[in-house]
């Protein structure tokens, strides 16, 4: 076919000149420019000029001067050809139609056409197409089979299309469209296929083909003009026909011949259908004509018989002219009357009854009288019709045979109705037949769309799904029939459910994507297979050659006669020899055929040489392949690590973690929870969204070592490292109730030294790391007989958690320290010292109190360079490790110093303080002196100090005891509570929303100015903020406070008002609650979370992954392996060693992954990203340390935990956290000790106004409220009501109550105004959206019926009455 296309291009290249370029050019050109030539070389050999073309156009214009539209259509044809909208055949057909009947114009147009395209009169009158020969169809099918021998699906699809057409399941248009799609890239086949189409479709398909070719050539920018290709169409057809007959393949099977018959059938299809329609139409017309003829014949017979019966003389000759005219007019009137009756009668049944009556009368069944009675029953509703019928009946009596006329009328009408019903039935039958045919065609079409397609190519995404692997085939999918299937097989075998494959890079391995290690194994297998096939092939060829050579040597074969080399060598043997000699392979095989005796010894030697060479090569490669298998076998089985690494970074992002808990919150938000929150007074139910158990506490030590080691690698400074480790040890592990590390335990530096031979250069690092959390984690104070697991942390500096250090080292002398503290805090004004006990002054109960806030240490505490200590009375500094030791220390000091000691205060963290110096801070007048505070210290007011954990004894004799126990502590606490005041038991006084945070003690130049700002803010908080009660956070949300004031209010309790339900909901003694933001939530999640995401993949985070490694290492399989190999170290220690090697950079990721696989197995894929996870965790710790808001949350946590266990309320803590975080996410993190569990809940951001709850009040405020503000009896004279005297005079003689009742008639009063009062400042403020309501209805106007004079008199009377009342 390529040669034919080349010939086309070659022959078409001579038509190059455009038409109409100048008048001087030859007559071969057309006056139409561009688009290619219509022809070259006319009938006459003379040169044609442009003048000839213009002359022809003028002649056409003159011919159609009265038909201007035809001339315009001719010009449009030429323009379409110029624009390549039509081809030469289209031009010729349209010109023939235009110039039909004008032969001179047709002959003139032939001069512009190429040779072979002339329009003849025979063509104009009767164009016919050459009959396609059967051999041409066979040749075309063989050509398709040869063309698509490598793609049998196209060939089979083509045969199936022809088969469907032969069965009348497809029409010719569908056949052509599908074949066009099939031969889209083979235009020559499609062009040849159009020759076999019927005449009605061939021109259209030919034009469509040429347009598609033109588009393709235009896109390519090259190729022969389309019209020039059409000029040689007939010649090419003749050449292809001759060539196809000569090259016809006789090996076509019988099925192909049957399919080829459909090609010839296409030419007869249209003619058969037309003939069939014509025959059906003629048969229907014939039936109608026969019915009419029967009626006429019946009428003539009846007429003759009636004449005989009446005695008239019958004659066969034609009647007279007047008689014929009378009968004709009578018949016409009768038919018109019947039509009128049919129109007037609405019912078809009545009309049929009328005709039956006439029919019975014509047959002689009834008489005239009976006919009139029956007709009157039918036409009785229409008197005019009945009268006309009677008149017509009377006129017809004189005419020969009225019965014949009635018979004709009834028969004609009945015949027409029968013909109508017959035609209707025929149409219905035709429609039913067409519907059946269309249904069969539709069924075949539905089957046809699946023919030629494998199941893998079907789109079954919308079909019913059984399992992830099986889909139900569509109901119209053709199920192949199965032979020899028994009943047992039919009961269990499946024909309708198919396995759907999805996703792969090729068709060889569809169900799972290969990883790189599998690719290596597959390549090894391919190499091994190829080499084995080479060895087997060369071995087989050598064996055959050796056998043939032995036969030749033994002279058991004769080369004369019928010796064939194929009898001794297989095709594979010969192919092996050809490949062995490369380009000379065919020559070698020819030598074997010509002279096997001389060629075989050389070939056999060569074969054995190659066999030995390839055998040695395989032995060498076996070593390489074994190494590849050993390295990649376990890796190839790990299909999860590839996807896990991709998803792990996304799953560990803060956005993904926050989104996960939000989704869980939305799912768990039920209507019951909403009702519970409403019934609890806007308190949210405690329903955790995430819960995690800590099964192995030993893992915490490993996590601490990993974090400490990573901080040395990641953090840039030692100070930053220290802050991160303090946050981990003093907050995170305390929240999780991790036991404190004892002094002398193995430090991280020792672990790293033993595992990696690395040592830290600083000698002090070991000591400081051992004592990182001694202060905070060893001290637990016992109250009321129970051990309270308080946080035991102090608040000082920026955050007490981060700046606390327990090294116990002393870098400054005590005197220097005291001097420095005094000098630092000496600049504070007097106003700053009076904040803590301002409320006590107002109540008149000035008591001796010492600020015991956990954010400030007693005198003798050093907060420089992270050193913290406590000074006892003897001047020595130390740290008490147990509460009992603190009590013993207090007792010993009391015994030694006696009366010199004022008070011993034991803080919530177990530290002792000497208050003798604190007492000295009071001046001689008994007034409060300056209270020393550290930078950022929290200073609760004096009236709420009873909520903190204190130990004090006002009477020295009560403290003179030799032993102190937990019971003694409880008694002392009770005494302290009794002596602190009557309001010690009141709940909620520790939660004032406007108590000041505390002022920073700074040595900067602007310290006094900042101090003044803080004092101003504190004063404003006392006077305004406390008056808001539970709504102080609402005031802040509305922006009534400046931003600086909000900062100072960040860690203060919200309100003194606490819900009654909150008194019952105390915090459990073995649990710790922390309210944090997104940073803390992500920190705890990275520490330990195992959640199931949407892909059912465990997202183990640090704790869970280390725990999984330890679990796998201690599994039964690992124990069995260790029993076999007694020399192998502990698998978990080996894993930790590999992890530390990865962290310090001495091992690569691939080595670490191989080590994990060797230790744990394929389940170790979750450990491959541990380095990134630890890095992310340390970065999160750094973010928490550096963020101001996170530090404030830590301060608030310490502040709340510094209270006594009975004084801590979760609702107050939550409201304080809300003030800090505003509209940010708030998380409730609760850790319990037994069992060790972490619960996380995302709280609702409630902005609604909470209800006010009943609370207990201070006695002083109660006395003021009841005795002064709301008192009805007072020494002052009450003001008289302002009443108009003229109104009072109208009710003379009535008492005050009656007057009030009389005056309030028709008045509506609603007292709804509310006000609230601050318990500290007694300031009153009104509640918004509340008011009092007073309304008096107007009197109705009197009737207007009264006269104007009467109204005037009434008005005058009222005026005189008013004057008399005023006197």
Curated annotation (Swiss-Prot):
Region span, Disordered: 14-44, 212-322, 417-446, 786-883, 912-946, 958-1031
Biased composition (Gly residues): 33-42
Modified residues (Phosphoserine): 1023
Compositional bias annotation for Basic and acidic residues: 230-286, 299-311, 424-446, 806-819, 958-967
Top-level taxon: Eukaryota
GO molecular function (one): transcription corepressor activity
Name of the protein: Paired amphipathic helix protein Sin3-like 2
Comp. bias regions, Polar residues: 851-876, 912-923
Alphabetical list of PROSITE patterns matching this protein: PAH
Chief location bin: nucleus
Presence of the UniProt keyword Transcription in the record: yes
Record-linked InterPro entries: HDAC_interact_dom (IPR013194), PAH (IPR003822), PAH_sf (IPR036600), Sin3-like (IPR039774), Sin3_C (IPR031693)
Membrane found in the keyword field: no
Function: Acts as a transcriptional repressor. Plays roles in regulating gene expression and genome stability.
Segments traversing the membrane: none
Keywords (A to Z) from UniProt: Nucleus, Phosphoprotein, Repeat, Repressor, Transcription, Transcription regulation
An annotated GO cellular component: nucleus
PAH domain: residues covered: 46-116, 130-200, 327-396
Subcellular localization(s) per the UniProt record: Nucleus
Regions of compositional bias (Acidic residues) in chain numbering: 968-989, 997-1016
Pfam families xref list: PAH (PF02671), Sin3_corepress (PF08295), Sin3a_C (PF16879)
Classification of source organism: Eukaryota, Viridiplantae, Streptophyta, Embryophyta, Tracheophyta
Biological source species: Arabidopsis thaliana (Mouse-ear cress)
């Amino acid at each position: 076919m390529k040669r034919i296309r080349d010939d086309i291009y070659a022959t078409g290249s001579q038509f190059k000149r455009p038409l109409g370029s100048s008048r001087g050019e030859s007559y071969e050109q057309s006056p139409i420019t561009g688009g290619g030539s219509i022809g070259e070389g006319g009938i006459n050999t003379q040169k044609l000029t442009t003048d000839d073309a213009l002359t022809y156009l003028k002649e056409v214009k003159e011919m159609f001067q009265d038909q201007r539209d035809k001339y315009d259509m001719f010009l449009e044809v030429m323009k379409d050809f110029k624009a390549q909208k039509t081809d030469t055949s289209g031009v010729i057909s349209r010109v023939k139609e235009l110039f039909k009947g004008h032969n001179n114009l047709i002959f003139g147009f032939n001069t512009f056409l190429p040779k072979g395209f002339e329009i003849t009169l025979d063509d104009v009158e009767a164009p016919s197409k050459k009959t396609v020969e059967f051999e041409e169809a066979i040749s075309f099918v063989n050509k398709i089979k040869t063309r698509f021998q490598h793609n049998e699906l196209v060939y089979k699809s083509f045969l199936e299309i022809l088969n469907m057409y032969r069965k009348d399941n497809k029409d010719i248009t569908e056949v052509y469209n599908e074949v066009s799609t099939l031969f889209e890239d083979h235009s020559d086949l499609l062009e040849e296929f159009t020759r076999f189409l019927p005449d009605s479709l061939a021109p259209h398909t030919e034009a469509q083909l040429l347009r598609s070719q033109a588009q393709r050539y235009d896109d390519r920018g090259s190729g022969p003009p389309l019209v020039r290709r059409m000029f040689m169409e007939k010649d090419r057809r003749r050449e292809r026909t001759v060539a196809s007959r000569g090259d016809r393949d006789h090996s076509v099977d019988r099925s192909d011949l049957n399919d080829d018959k459909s090609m010839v059938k296409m030419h007869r299809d249209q003619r058969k259908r037309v003939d069939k329609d014509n025959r059906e139409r003629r048969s229907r017309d014939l039936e109608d004509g026969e019915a009419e003829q029967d009626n006429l014949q019946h009428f003539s017979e009846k007429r003759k018989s009636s004449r005989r019966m009446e005695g008239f003389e019958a004659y066969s000759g034609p009647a007279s002219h007047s008689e014929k005219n009378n009968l004709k007019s009578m018949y016409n009137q009768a038919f018109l009357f019947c039509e009128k009756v049919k129109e007037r009668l609405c019912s078809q049944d009545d009309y049929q009854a009328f005709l039956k009556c006439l029919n019975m009368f014509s047959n002689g069944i009834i008489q005239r009288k009976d006919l009139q009675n029956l007709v009157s029953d039918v036409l009785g509703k229409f008197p005019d019709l009945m009268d006309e019928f009677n008149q017509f009946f009377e006129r017809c009596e004189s005419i020969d045979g009225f019965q014949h006329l009635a018979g004709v009328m009834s028969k004609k009408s009945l015949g027409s109705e029968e013909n109508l019903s017959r035609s209707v039935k025929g149409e219905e039958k035709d429609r039913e037949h067409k519907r059946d045919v269309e249904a069969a065609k539709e069924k075949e079409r539905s089957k046809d769309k699946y023919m030629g397609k494998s199941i893998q190519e079907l789109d079954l995404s919308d079909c019913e799904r059984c399992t992830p692997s099986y889909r139900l085939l569509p109901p119209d999918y053709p199920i192949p029939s199965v032979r020899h299937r028994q009943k047992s097989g039919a009961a269990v075998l499946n024909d309708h459910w198919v396995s759907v494959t999805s996703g792969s890079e090729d068709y060889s391995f569809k169900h799972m994507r290969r990883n790189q290690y599998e690719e290596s194994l597959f390549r090894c297998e391919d190499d091994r297979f190829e080499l084995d096939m080479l060895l087997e092939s060369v071995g087989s060829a050598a064996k055959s050659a050796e056998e043939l050579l032995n036969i030749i040597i033994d002279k058991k074969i004769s080369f004369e006669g019928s010796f064939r080399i194929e009898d001794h060598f297989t095709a594979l043997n010969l192919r092996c020899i050809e490949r062995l000699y490369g380009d000379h392979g065919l020559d070698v095989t020819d030598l074997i055929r010509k002279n096997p005796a001389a060629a075989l010894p050389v070939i056999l030697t060569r074969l054995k040489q190659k066999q030995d060479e390839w055998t040695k090569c395989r032995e060498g490669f076996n070593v390489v392949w074994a190494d590849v298998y050993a390295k990649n076998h376990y890796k190839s089985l790990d299909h999860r690590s590839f996807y896990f690494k991709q998803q792990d970074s996304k799953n560990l992002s803060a956005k993904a973690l926050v989104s996960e808990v939000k989704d869980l919150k939305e799912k768990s938000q039920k209507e019951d929870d909403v009702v519970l929150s409403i019934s609890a007074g806007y308190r949210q139910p405690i329903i955790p969204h995430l819960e995690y158990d800590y099964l192995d506490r030993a893992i915490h030590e490993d996590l601490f070592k990993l974090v400490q080691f990573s901080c040395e690698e990641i953090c840039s400074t030692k100070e930053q490292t220290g802050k991160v480790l303090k946050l981990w040890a003093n907050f995170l592990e305390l929240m999780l109730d991790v036991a404190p590390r004892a002094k002398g335990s193995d430090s991280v530096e020792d672990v790293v030294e033993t595992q990696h031979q690395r040592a830290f250069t600083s000698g002090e690092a070991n000591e400081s790391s051992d004592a990182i959390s001694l202060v905070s984690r060893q001290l637990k104070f016992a109250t009321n007989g129970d051990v309270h697991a308080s946080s035991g942390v102090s608040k000082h500096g920026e955050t007490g958690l981060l700046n606390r250090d327990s090294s116990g080292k002393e870098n400054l002398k005590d005197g220097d320290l005291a001097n420095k503290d005094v000098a630092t805090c000496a600049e504070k004004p007097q106003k700053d010292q009076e904040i803590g006990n301002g409320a006590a002054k107002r109540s008149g109960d000035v008591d001796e109190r010492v600020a015991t806030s956990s954010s400030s240490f007693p005198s003798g505490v050093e907060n420089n360079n992270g050193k913290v200590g406590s000074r006892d009375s003897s001047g020595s500094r130390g740290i008490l490790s147990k509460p009992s030791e603190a009590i013993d220390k207090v007792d010993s000091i009391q015994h030694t110093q006696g009366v010199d000691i004022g008070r011993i205060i034991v803080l919530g963290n177990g530290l002792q303080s000497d208050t003798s110096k604190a007492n000295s801070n009071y001046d001689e007048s008994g007034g409060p002196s300056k209270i020393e505070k550290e930078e950022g210290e929290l200073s609760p007011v004096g009236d709420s100090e009873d909520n903190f954990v204190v130990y004090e004894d006002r009477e020295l004799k009560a403290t003179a005891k030799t032993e102190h126990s937990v019971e003694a502590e409880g008694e002392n606490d009770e005494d302290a509570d009794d002596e602190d005041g009557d309001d010690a038991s009141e709940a909620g006084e520790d939660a004032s929303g406007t108590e000041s945070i505390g002022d920073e003690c700074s040595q900067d130049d602007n310290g006094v100015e900042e101090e003044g700002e803080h004092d101003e803010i504190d004063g404003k908080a006392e006077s305004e903020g406390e008056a808001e009660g539970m709504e102080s956070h609402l005031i802040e949300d509305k922006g009534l406070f400046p931003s600086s004031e909000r900062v100072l209010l960040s860690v203060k309790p919200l309100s003194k008002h606490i819900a009654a339900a909150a008194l019952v909901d105390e915090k459990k003694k073995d649990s710790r609650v922390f309210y944090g933001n997104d940073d803390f939530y992500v920190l705890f999640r990275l520490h330990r979370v195992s959640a199931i995401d949407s892909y059912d993949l465990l997202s183990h985070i640090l704790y869970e992954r280390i725990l999984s490694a330890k679990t796998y290492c201690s599994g039964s399989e690992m124990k069995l392996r260790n029993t076999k190999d007694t020399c192998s170290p502990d698998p978990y220690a080996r894993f930790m060693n590999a992890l530390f090697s990865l962290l310090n950079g001495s091992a690569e990721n691939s080595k670490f992954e191989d080590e994990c696989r060797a230790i744990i197995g394929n389940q170790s894929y979750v450990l491959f990203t541990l380095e990134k996870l630890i890095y992310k965790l340390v970065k999160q710790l750094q973010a928490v340390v550096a963020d101001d808001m996170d530090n404030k949350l830590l301060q608030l946590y310490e502040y709340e935990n510094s209270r006594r266990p009975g004084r801590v309320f979760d609702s107050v803590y939550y409201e304080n956290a809300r003030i800090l975080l505003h509209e940010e996410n708030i998380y409730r993190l609760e850790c319990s000790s037994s069992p060790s569990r972490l619960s996380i809940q995302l709280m609702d951001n409630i902005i609604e106004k909470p209800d006010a709850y009943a609370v207990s009040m201070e006695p002083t405020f109660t006395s003021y409220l009841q005795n002064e503000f709301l008192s009805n009896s007072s020494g002052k004279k009450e003001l008289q009501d302002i009443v108009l005297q003229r109104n009072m005079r109208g009710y003379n003689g009535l008492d005050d109550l009656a007057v009030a009742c009389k005056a309030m008639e028709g008045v509506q009063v609603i007292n709804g105004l509310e006000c609230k009062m601050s318990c500290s400042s007694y300031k009153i403020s009104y509640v918004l959206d509340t008011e009092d309501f007073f309304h008096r209805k107007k009197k109705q106007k009197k009737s207007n019926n009264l006269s104007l004079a009467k109204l005037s008199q009434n008005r005058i009377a009222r005026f005189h009455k008013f004057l008399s009342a005023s006197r």
